[in-house]
Amino acid sequence: MARKLKIDILTLFPEMFDLFNLSMIGRAKKNGIIEINTYNIRDYTIDKHKKTDDYPYGGGAGMVMTPQPIVDSIRSVKESNKGKVIFLGPRGKKFDQEDAKKLADREELIILCGHYEGIDERVYKYIDEEYSLGDFVLTGGEMACIPIVDSICRMIPGVLSKSESYIEESFYSGLLEYPQYTRPEEFEGARVPDVLISGHHENIRKWRRKQALKITKDRRKDLFDKLVMTKEDKKLLNDNEL
């Protein structure tokens, strides 16, 4: 029986995740490979006005998400989901492909999306892991959740059309992806490289590897420096014929 991944998302804006009904993730949901549920944190508040935020103690700009509705939503979801609680916030580890692989190996996940100026510090007692997309400001955790869930789901067997698809993508192998071309062979004077239409599969493989190495070296030196170069890689970088 194929493995299934269940993701429960706690958010103030569940409608933002309707896009998971589209494209490959939508197909995976229909095929029973992935289950994605959204829960509105506002439904768990005991405030008569349905408030989920309040002014910060000590003053300061903005509003802070109150602990009660968040903690109660976590407790409720945990009745049917035993996965770890993942919070998306600025203090978290910068999310990368290795994290996507790790999370894709799990059967259940609970993702908490923050909003406003953040969450009450007392909520962290109920959080297992925290991730950030990078050193920039987003309107809310929902904006980070979408690409993170997408990167996790595409690692699940059966989500992509063929198992090789994600293996050759940028970052999975530690390299940026090689250039891609499609028809026509010539467009406004720019031709597809001859090697790609030669039919020589080994030369095509070498060309793609060389291009990936060059692009990564030029554009992401941080990734290139982490790469364990093979003898072939070193030779390809110095080969002017490919």
Curated annotation (Swiss-Prot):
SUPFAM superfamilies (alphabetical): alpha/beta knot (SSF75217)
Say where the protein is mainly found: cytoplasm
Question: What top-tier enzyme class does this entry carry?
Answer: transferase
State the CDD domains in the record. Answer: TrmD-like
Which UniProt key words apply to this protein?
A: Cytoplasm, Methyltransferase, S-adenosyl-L-methionine, Transferase, tRNA processing
Q: Does the keyword Transcription regulation apply?
A: no
> One Pfam family this chain carries?
tRNA_m1G_MT
Q: Name one GO cellular component term.
A: cytosol
User: Subcellular location, in the record's words?
Assistant: Cytoplasm
Entry-linked InterPro entries: Alpha/beta_knot_MTases, tRNA_m1G_MeTrfase_C_sf, tRNA_m1G_MeTrfase_TrmD, tRNA_m1G_MTases_N, tRNA_MeTrfase_TRMD/TRM10
Q: Which molecular function GO terms apply here?
A: tRNA (guanine(37)-N1)-methyltransferase activity
Question: What residues bind S-adenosyl-L-methionine, as annotated?
Answer: G114, L133, G134, D135, F136, V137, L138
Describe the reaction catalysed, as an equation.
guanosine(37) in tRNA + S-adenosyl-L-methionine = N(1)-methylguanosine(37) in tRNA + S-adenosyl-L-homocysteine + H(+)
Cite the EC number.
2.1.1.228
One GO BP: tRNA N1-guanine methylation
Per the record's keyword annotation, is Cytoplasm included, yes or no?
yes
What is the documented function of this protein?
Answer: Specifically methylates guanosine-37 in various tRNAs.
Its assembly, as annotated, is: Homodimer.
The record's family statement is: Belongs to the RNA methyltransferase TrmD family.
Q: Which PANTHER family match?
A: TRNA (GUANINE-N(1)-)-METHYLTRANSFERASE
> What name does the UniProt record give this protein?
tRNA (guanine-N(1)-)-methyltransferase
The protein's organism comes out as Clostridium acetobutylicum (strain ATCC 824 / DSM 792 / JCM 1419 / IAM 19013 / LMG 5710 / NBRC 13948 / NRRL B-527 / VKM B-1787 / 2291 / W)
Taxonomic lineage: Bacteria, Bacillati, Bacillota, Clostridia, Eubacteriales
